[in-house]
């Protein structure tokens, strides 16, 4: 039985738990635990998951994999300790790795601990192509994020713009992924994931657009290299519980987790 600990007790955590506990066959395959702020989270968790409030207790539980499903802060707070203990660490808040010192430190701890850092593709696809294209000198990668105003309420309010008054697309940001991931830690983990797969945080160009006509959370990726060109457009439905996050993200994490333990990896 594989032991998986999840950091965070919010929407993504609950979705992961429900998926991995959906059938008796899955419950026989996975033993699950959650690191939460309280033994009784505000939203109840499935009864088959153990709940801890201390990372040392989680590691004493001897997980095979720790899944961060909380925030960039959780990556900084818990990543090093898990990797030093020899436990592989799956990072959903990939924007934390825009901190190059943190990224280098976590990588060194993973190497020393004989374990791995895993970054799921999250809301996008095509990372296998991007990894190959990035091996060609001069490869270029550009990413455009388009989300409806509901995904950017605090940002619009800070600009003095009423979300209901947005009638035309607004460019919130244009620049490197390194800056985008830090400026928008809850919305642009995709940019950091692309950068890790491709040409790096500084070279990956990002444009962030608030679009009242967007049918969902839209991700547009353009890649150009000596091997050819590649364009991908994805329109994801927002999570019913969190419009900042695409609905597909949690299931992608589940798929990545299952692949980690599978004898056949795609």
Per-range role (PLM):
Residues 12:
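Hydrophobic/small residue at the entry helix of a nucleotide-binding pocket
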Residues 55-57, 61-84, 96-100:
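Beta-loop-alpha module in the N-terminal Rossmann-like domain of NAD(P)-dependent dehydrogenases
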Residues 25-45:
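NAD(P)-binding Rossmann-fold cofactor-contacting core
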Residues 94-115:
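Rossmann-fold NAD(P)-binding glycine/threonine-rich loop
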Residues 15, 19-29:
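A short, Lys/Arg-enriched amphipathic alpha-helix followed by its capping loop at the start of a domain
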Residues 88-90:
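A short hydrophobic/small-residue beta-strand
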